[in-house]
Amino acid sequence: MTALDIEEIPGVGPATADRLRDAGYITVESIATATPVDLAEAAELGESTTKKIIKAAREMADIGGFKTGTDILARRQDVLKLKTLVPEIDELFGGGLETQAITELYGEFGSGKSQIAHQLAVNCQLPQELGGLGGSCLYIDTENTFRPERIEQMAEGLELADLPEGYVVPTPDEFLANIHVARAHSSDHQMLLIDAARELSNELTASGLPVKLVIIDSLTSLFRSEYAGRGTLAGRQQKLNRHMHDLFKLVDDLNAVALVTNQVMANPGLLFGDPTKPIGGNIVGHTATYRVYLRKSKAGKRIARLVDSPNLPEGEATFMVETAGIKPC
């Protein structure tokens, strides 16, 4: 299907199109799914103007009506898979982490959440034939856990076979250059970084290395520290809900993978079984497409359990965290 140019939208001339692109709205679909208020603020346009533009974009993109299951299946053909290169984990995900979806990793400290995030920041730059997506990575760091030295170790530790003809594996420095890191200092700043990600993705697409992975490590840390106590819970959940939906719209527009890590807490009311539960409640639970519980095991092993998915059965996979990266047991 041929992509539509935003200048084809009735009422959008070259000047307006430039404003929209600068704000990160580079496709007709991204405009069609925006709200008038968001579009007006981002592109500095009048709200009445943005309402007309959004209406026209929805008509062009055929968004807002019912579609048959066949139509949905056809769109699913655009979904790509990002591999961890650990066969057991990739099988758990049905071939890898999906684009146009949010995958949540939750678990206690040291369970491997940030390690998997670092590994995928490397892997996403590989060509599709080698399990990657041939793109760049945006990494929103809320806990100061991003370590470039770890990226270098993982880049050097890649074990690749059957390289495509003419393909040269990037150097560790080249891998690092394609990971764009932003340190979030507050929940509001974290939410604004999704808007900044739209603008940066526009530039990177033009450079030939589109954004194919967006990582937030961790999703709830800043929200949790700023909104303490039950009296602030409603406000926190409202902001978190908006943040998650903005993230989903971003990766849906970019056909990219969203990976978020999440903290956990103990459920004191549970008398039997594992009392560990993720932060964020139903808001995160309903918005994340895939939820994976990570926990430590014996002899340095880690266990990844897929606990929620719209199309895959529950299951477990084991892996090791080594100097060279995430590896099979």
UniProtKB/Swiss-Prot annotation:
Which GO biological process annotations does it have?
DNA recombination; DNA repair
Q: Where does ATP bind?
A: 107-114
Gene Ontology molecular function terms on file: ATP binding; ATP hydrolysis activity; ATP-dependent DNA damage sensor activity; damaged DNA binding
The record's InterPro entries line, in alphabetical order, gives: AAA+_ATPase (IPR003593), DNA_recomb/repair_Rad51_C (IPR013632), DNA_recomb/repair_RadA (IPR011938), DNA_recomb/repair_RecA-like (IPR016467), DNA_repair_Rad51/TF_NusA_a-hlx (IPR010995), P-loop_NTPase (IPR027417), RecA_ATP-bd (IPR020588), RecA_monomer-monomer_interface (IPR020587)
Gene3D superfamilies, A to Z: 5' to 3' exonuclease, C-terminal subdomain, P-loop containing nucleotide triphosphate hydrolases
What keywords are annotated for this sequence in UniProt? ATP-binding, DNA damage, DNA recombination, DNA-binding, Nucleotide-binding
A Pfam family (short name) is Rad51
- Which PANTHER family is this protein grouped with? MEIOTIC RECOMBINATION PROTEIN DMC1_LIM15 HOMOLOG (PTHR22942:SF30), RECA/RAD51/RADA DNA STRAND-PAIRING FAMILY MEMBER (PTHR22942)
Q: Per its database record, what is this protein's job?
A: Involved in DNA repair and in homologous recombination. Binds and assemble on single-stranded DNA to form a nucleoprotein filament. Hydrolyzes ATP in a ssDNA-dependent manner and promotes DNA strand exchange between homologous DNA molecules.
Q: Which family does it belong to?
A: Belongs to the eukaryotic RecA-like protein family.
Name of protein: DNA repair and recombination protein RadA
Which source organism does the UniProt entry give?
Answer: Methanocorpusculum labreanum (strain ATCC 43576 / DSM 4855 / Z)
